[in-house]
């Protein structure tokens, strides 16, 4: 939601993103044809914003969640390189997937460069992190950033996933949920309900009491059981 919001909220980002998408996917287009195609993708994506919760009403919570995430990562990357050891994990690359786009789109790029340049640099380095060997941290060595990110999930995302799944289960077309003390509303999203069910089913297969303790301490456990 953060990436989609920043990509299509402001005029300057709409113009940049639509042209970039068309230029990347259809590099042979030029002039009027390029402008026409860019306008079409722009209109389509802007029109989809309410479907994914990117509305003026939700804008404060979405932008707050972005700055909160950046602050967590900023306190981390000034001391460590990877979340779970001296080698990258799927978690690092998962964050990279979204942050790479945010680090190249106009407005979020400026936010990252001006406010958290260390995070901007970290994202850039992650792009060339394949093949790095290293060691995994033990549970006792878990970095504060990991628990901070889990609490972040328990504040901004897991409540949304549960509310979305519950709304679908009750045949509702819209959901409303409190995230970090603010009301967030959007139409239900079936794919995310599928993702939530998969996440819970995978967790049910794990027999790891120490993991349950960490998740409980970070307020994630109630959303996964």
Segments (PLM) and residue ranges:
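Internal, well-ordered alpha/beta segment that forms a basic, Gly-enriched binding/recognition surface
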Residues: 1-64
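Inter-helical turn/loop segments and adjacent helix faces that build the functional surface
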Residues: 52-57, 79-84, 105-110
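A conserved active-site cap/scaffold subdomain adjacent to cofactor or substrate pockets
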Residues: 61-68, 78, 97
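Surface-exposed helix-capping loop/turn segments at secondary-structure junctions
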Residues: 75-85, 132, 205, 209
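GST superfamily/GST-like fold recognition
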Residues: 83-103
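Short His-centered aromatic/hydrophobic patch
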Residues: 98-132
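Small-residue-rich helix-loop
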Residues: 138-158
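C-terminal non-catalytic accessory extensions
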Residues: 182-225
